[in-house]
């Protein structure tokens, strides 16, 4: 254990995803060795993120405006909505250059052991979005692109039950080919592009 602010910094860094105690310690001592101006830039960026970044009112993507750039782009096909778990998954799909629709971010996946149920996800917003015809366009297809792991598959199954009886709506799931237990964000562009192109109809 170190004293005072140094240990506080290590503790806070250790709360970040994928950062263990040793990594937190290395990052902390790196920060102690850089120029004060570098620290000032980092804290300035963090303050801008805290104060200026919000979630898109339509899809839940990160944005610095009420609507993200994708929901604001009239060239995107508003009738097709790809459902993902997190904003980072949008970037994974965008890298494929295979999808020209819009997105809906759930904010996670069903995980009862961690206390995450349907009410903790943006499922109500999805149903409202389909029913209210955003931008006067009917949503005719939703593509479920949750992660190919236990939580993602459970979420996909739940979504199918909620969506399958909506008239005029086709529910599809990205095709197999992604490694089971993996995360969408780590899939290469070719594999994910093929999974999108080969999506299967569920309802």
Swiss-Prot record:
Report C4-type zinc finger ranges.
Answer: 56-71
Q: What is a biological process (GO) this protein takes part in?
A: DNA repair
Q: What is the role of this chain? A: May play a role in DNA repair. It seems to be involved in an RecBC-independent recombinational process of DNA repair. It may act with RecF and RecO.
The text of the family note is: Belongs to the RecR family.
Q: For the Toprim domain, which residue ranges apply?
A: 79-179
Q: Name one Pfam family in it.
A: RecR_C
Q: Which organism is it from?
A: Mycobacterium tuberculosis (strain ATCC 25177 / H37Ra)
User: Which UniProt keywords are listed?
Assistant: DNA damage, DNA recombination, DNA repair, Metal-binding, Zinc, Zinc-finger
The membrane-spanning stretches of this chain are: none
GO MF, one term, reads: zinc ion binding
Can you name this protein? Recombination protein RecR
């Amino acid at each position: 254990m170190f004293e005072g602010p140094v240990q506080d910094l290590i503790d806070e860094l250790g709360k970040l995803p994928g950062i263990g105690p040793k990594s937190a310690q290395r990052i902390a001592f790196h920060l102690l060795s850089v120029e004060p101006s570098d620290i000032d830039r980092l804290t300035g960026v963090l303050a801008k993120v805290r104060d200026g970044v919000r979630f898109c009112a339509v899809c839940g993507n990160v944005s610095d405006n009420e609507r993200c750039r994708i929901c604001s782009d009239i060239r995107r096909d508003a009738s097709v909505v790809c459902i993902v778990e997190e904003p980072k998954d949008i970037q994974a799909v965008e890298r494929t250059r295979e999808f020209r629709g819009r997105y809906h971010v759930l904010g996670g996946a069903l995980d009862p052991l961690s206390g995450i149920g349907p009410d903790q996800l943006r499922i109500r917003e999805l149903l409202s979005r389909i029913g209210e015809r955003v931008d006067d366009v009917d949503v005719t297809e939703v593509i479920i692109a949750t992660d190919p792991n236990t939580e993602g598959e459970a979420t996909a199954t739940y979504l199918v039950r909620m969506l399958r009886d909506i008239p005029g709506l086709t529910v599809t799931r990205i095709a197999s080919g992604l490694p089971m237990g993996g995360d969408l964000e780590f899939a290469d562009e070719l594999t994910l592009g093929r999974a999108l192109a080969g999506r299967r109809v569920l309802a």
